[in-house]
Swiss-Prot record:
The lineage of its organism: Bacteria, Pseudomonadati, Pseudomonadota, Gammaproteobacteria, Lysobacterales. It is an enzyme of class 4 (lyase). Gene3D superfamilies: Aconitase, domain 4. It catalyses: (2R,3S)-3-isopropylmalate = (2S)-2-isopropylmalate. Keywords: Amino-acid biosynthesis, Branched-chain amino acid biosynthesis, Leucine biosynthesis, Lyase. Its EC number is 4.2.1.33. One of its GO terms (biological process) is L-leucine biosynthetic process. Heterodimer of LeuC and LeuD. It comes from Xylella fastidiosa (strain Temecula1 / ATCC 700964). One of its GO terms (cellular component) is 3-isopropylmalate dehydratase complex. Pfam families: Aconitase_C. This is 3-isopropylmalate dehydratase small subunit. Belongs to the LeuD family. LeuD type 1 subfamily.
Amino acid sequence: MKPFTQHTGLVCPLDRVNVDTDQIIPKQFLKSIKRTGFGPNLFDEWRYLDAGQPGQDNSKRPINSDFVLNFPRYRGASVLLARDNFGCGSSREHAAWALDEYGFRTVIAPSFADIFFNNSFKNGLLPLVLNKVEVDALFAQCQVTEGYTLTVDLAAQQVITLDGTTYAFQIDTFRKHCLLNGLDDIGLTLQHAEAIRAFEATHRIRQPWLFAPLR
C-alpha cells in the first residue's frame, strides 16, 4: 500500500449528499475477481449517458458533459470534496478501489458511511472528516477558483488551503500510523514475521499431535 504523508492536489467538488457505493462503482462491474480495473468506471452512471458493461471501450461511449468529473477544469483531480454520508449503501470494497485507481488520494466530507470509511483506510485512501461549515467554505472556494488545490498534511493533521487557512482534523492513532507507513493488513502481519516463525517452530514441538498425518 502506498504511504500517505502529505498530499497536494486539485480538488473536485461533488455536491451531492448520500452518494452510495452503487453510484461510486455500479454492481455490474463487481464480477471481476481482481482488485484493479475499476477506476475507468468510477461514477459510471453519472459520467456516461449509456449503460456501461465490464470490458467495454469507454472511449467510444457518450460522455455526460454535465457531470462535474467530466469538466475540463477538474481533469486530474486527486482530492474529492463531498457531502454528508458519502459511501453509504451496500458493502463493497470495490468503491475504495475505484476511487484510488482513478487517482483520488483523499475524500473530504462532513460524514462517511462506516463500512466505506473502514475500507478506505485499508486501501490507502484517506476519508477526511471536516465539519459542515468548513466543507461549505471549501466548496465555495473550489467553485469560484479554477485550478483550486489544497494540501493535506497527515502528520500534522491539517488541511491547508490556497490562502493559507488551515483546518485541523481528527484521525485514529493506529490508522494514522498505517497510512503514514503504507501498511495494509498484510503489511501489518509481515511486521511480525519473525515472531510468527518462532511461534510456529516451538508450537510444532510442544503440540506435535496437531501436525500428525490423519489416519
